[in-house]
A protein has these predicted regions:
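Asp-based, Mg2+/Mn2+-dependent phosphohydrolase catalytic module
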Residues: 2-14, 22-24, 28-31, 35-39, ...
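Glycine-rich loop-to-alpha-helix module at the N-terminal edge of alpha/beta enzyme cores
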Residues: 47
């Protein structure tokens, strides 16, 4: 019997929202899949752009859901932001917090002083997601940023998956300050590589697999870090958006969910421009991908991705082909 996909890796660096849970609820099957990693001898780390909670709070939530999680296994964008600002500012520098108490805590841990008003003369602004942020908070940040202060965003995710649907993420709030000031922040979290390198180092991993639901953060960040990436279909991105992905956001593997880690990934072969995966096949010509297989068969989408990405290897923007489906 062929080896499972996970057998080629010594660790999983997993995203949270859209991979492990959506809103307050675990994604079906996700907890069991995470629990199984230990029996397979694979280490587990969580890499998240959620800056509204501390790593300890994130780990506690994961344990409530039944997932295996210790505090040190969680690496957040708020931690990355704290480390970045500490490397750029003198100890004791004042930093305006446009975000959560958890973000303020991370800033304090690195020897900086969190403040809440432009009147306190901060030399930097750090902006992270907090569902309670309002106009006054964004105005305070804008005053300080416009005055020339260093501006750091924990992440620029434009959306965040919730139980009721897709909601605006931190990137939308960052964009409001950018529109008001004409400035651009430095970004500490995904899709930048250091967050992934830090997580892999903590796990002493040489062969990590990055698993995420978002091309623009998880997959792009994992690719930038030089790690193997897998996209799951339990969150934001879909089969269609993954097929259309720009080159640097294309995953190495396409999975339905975390349970697919434990099955053999089908081999994809190139037969003179026709790409075969399982019983499905696909070829690309003149912006059209012709797929032989069923639309609900993931192997058909894997073949379609292989064909399209081979035909358009250097896509700087997302570009979707026209799909033509044929039955066997």
């Amino acid at each position: 019997m062929a080896d499972s996909l996970i057998s080629a890796f010594d660790a999983v660096l997993s995203d949270l929202d859209g991979v492990v849970y959506t809103g307050p609820h675990a994604i079906p099957g996700a907890v069991a899949s995470l629990q199984r990693l230990e029996t397979e001898g694979v280490r587990l780390g969580y890499v998240t752009n959620n800056a509204s909670r501390t790593p300890a709070q994130v780990a506690a939530h994961l344990r409530e859901l039944g997932a295996p999680a210790e505090d040190h296994q969680v690496v957040s964008s708020s931690q990355a932001a704290g480390e970045l600002l500490a490397s750029l500012l003198p100890a004791g520098a004042r930093v305006l917090i446009t975000g959560s108490a958890a973000l303020a805590h991370e800033i304090e841990l690195v020897g900086l002083v969190p403040v809440s008003s432009a009147a306190e003369n901060p030399v930097a602004v750090v902006q992270g997601f907090n569902p309670e942020i309002g106009w006054k908070d964004l105005a305070e940040a804008s005053y300080v940023v416009a005055g020339g202060a260093l501006w750091c965003a924990t992440n620029t995710d434009m959306t965040i998956p919730q139980a009721r649907g897709i909601a605006p993420g931190n990137g939308v709030l960052v964009a409001a300050v950018a529109a008001a000031t004409g400035k651009t922040p430095v970004v500490a979290g995904k899709p930048e590589a250091p967050l992934f390198h830090t997580a892999a180092k903590r796990l002493n991993s040489d062969r990590p697999l990055v698993v995420g639901d978002r091309l623009d953060t998880d997959i792009l960040g994992g690719n930038r870090a030089g790690f193997t990436t897998a996209a799951v279909l339990t969150g934001v991105d879909t089969k269609e958006t993954i097929l259309a992905a720009r080159s640097d956001e294309r995953p190495d593997y396409l999975l339905a969910d975390l349970a697919d880690l434990y099955v053999t990934y089908p081999q994809i072969t190139d037969d003179g421009g026709t790409f075969r995966c399982g019983a499905a096949s696909a070829h690309a010509h003149d912006g059209i991908v012709t797929v032989t297989g069923a639309e609900d068969d993931l192997d058909a989408w894997r073949a379609a991705c292989a064909a399209w990405w081979s035909a358009v290897p250097d896509a700087s923007t997302a570009r979707a082909p026209r799909l033509e489906w044929r039955r066997h």
